[in-house]
């Protein structure tokens, strides 16, 4: 997304999806035009082989799960949706966010112990594809809650109950939080590193 889920909220996510349909045809060709004379990355290059290996290891890990309490990917998808709906909706608070983060981590641990993927990895396997997506959703759901907990203000669709004006309206803190958050995984488990890109609103006139 071009803004993230915790300031402008769902509108930005929808805008990013819709805008892509008419911006990508003009931006991607222009980018590729500057690389027409470059050699293609060989299939046996170190970069390509590393990417293939990482993908294969992830698939193998998922297919090799044989837990004592098996469930399909949809079981975990539904539970994650409920957790985010009640713990990281438009109205958020510190206690619920912390609790939701812990519950998502527990759900992810159970996913990697008990998720059941029928069929074979080398066949057309839609359940495998779904399982890989749910694995991503679990990581993304945790990060959304971490970002909502980290953003110590109220703004737009990010409504923190501990940051309200006397009239009960959202209380922004542009002095400290007027930036886009971009996160990357850290080296340790459950660790994320935030990068901040400042927002400049001087050209906006209301």
Give the location of each predicted region.
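Glycine- and aromatic-enriched mobile tails/lids
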Residues: 1-204
């Amino acid at each position: 997304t071009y803004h993230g889920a915790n300031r402008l909220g769902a509108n930005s996510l929808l805008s990013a999806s819709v805008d892509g349909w008419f911006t990508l045809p003009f931006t991607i060709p222009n980018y590729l035009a500057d690389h027409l004379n470059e050699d293609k990355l060989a299939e046996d290059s170190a970069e390509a082989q590393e990417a293939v290996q990482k993908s294969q290891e992830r698939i193998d890990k998922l297919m090799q799960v044989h837990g004592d309490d098996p469930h399909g990917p949809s079981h975990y998808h539904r539970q994650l949706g409920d957790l985010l709906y009640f713990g990281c909706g438009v109205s958020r608070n510190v206690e619920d966010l912390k609790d939701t983060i812990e519950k998502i981590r527990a759900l992810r641990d159970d996913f990697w112990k008990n998720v059941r993927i029928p069929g074979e990895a080398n066949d057309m396997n839609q359940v495998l594809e779904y399982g890989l997506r749910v694995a991503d959703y679990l990581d993304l759901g945790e990060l959304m809650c971490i970002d909502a907990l980290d953003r110590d203000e109220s703004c737009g669709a990010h409504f923190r109950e501990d940051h309200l004006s006397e009239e009960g309206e959202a209380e922004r803190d542009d002095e400290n939080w007027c930036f886009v958050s971009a996160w990357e995984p850290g080296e340790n488990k459950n660790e994320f590193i935030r990068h901040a890109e400042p927002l400049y609103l001087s050209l906006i006139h209301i």
